[in-house]
Amino acid sequence: MSLLAQLDQKIAANGGLIVSCQPVPDSPLDKPDIVAAMALAAEQAGAVAIRIEGVANLQATRAVVSVPIIGIVKRDLEDSPVRITAYIEDVDALAQAGADIIAIDGTDRPRPVPVETLLARIHHHGLLAMTDCSTPEDGLACQKLGAEIIGTTLSGYTTPETPEEPDLTLVKRLSDAGCRVIAEGRYNTPAQAADAMRHGAWAVTVGSAITRLEHICQWYNTAMKKAVL
């Protein structure tokens, strides 16, 4: 059975939650063994897949979880706004570390390596390719190039202002066009994740609301301060 078919079964049985285990950089939680522990806890709680950033974190996580891992490498480049898995060597390192799915930036922006080249390299390793997109045009272009999974990950992050709510319209447009969509980006409540599934998402990735303790504390502190002012 193919990995996509296996995921279809897991999603049908468990609801389609993917947990992104990416601690705040330099957080006390930003250590491979802690990332792996969070991933294992997420798997035991019913996550159908895990999203991991960085080769060391991926290696540590691969050793303890059996669910599929979406691997990425983030870089801050001087000559490109693209941050997610921008280079061939990133793809190779993630494949060697045990990723099942490799996600790349799928936006139409200046980049060091073309999207189609990165997709070909992912498929060279026999892995599934996911593209993190920001618009319907991004997603449909990446689907035509052969990406098996389209993520709404970058919606709201390629523009001057980031909305507070997730982009359900993008989820629906891509789903209606026949894309296998992972809804991602600002899904901070179970209700929002469920809404994404109703809009046609194949699965939903949740990160900050589950694995970024600093963000969660900030949300509570902000709301509670407003209540007493």
Swiss-Prot record:
Domain of life per record: Bacteria
Single GO term (MF): N-acylglucosamine-6-phosphate 2-epimerase activity
SUPFAM superfamilies noted in UniProt: Ribulose-phoshate binding barrel
Main EC class the enzyme belongs to: isomerase
GO terms under cellular component: cytosol
UniProt-listed Pfam families: NanE
Function: Converts N-acetylmannosamine-6-phosphate (ManNAc-6-P) to N-acetylglucosamine-6-phosphate (GlcNAc-6-P).
Protein name in UniProt: Putative N-acetylmannosamine-6-phosphate 2-epimerase
Organism encoding this protein: Shigella dysenteriae serotype 1 (strain Sd197)
Protein's gene: nanE
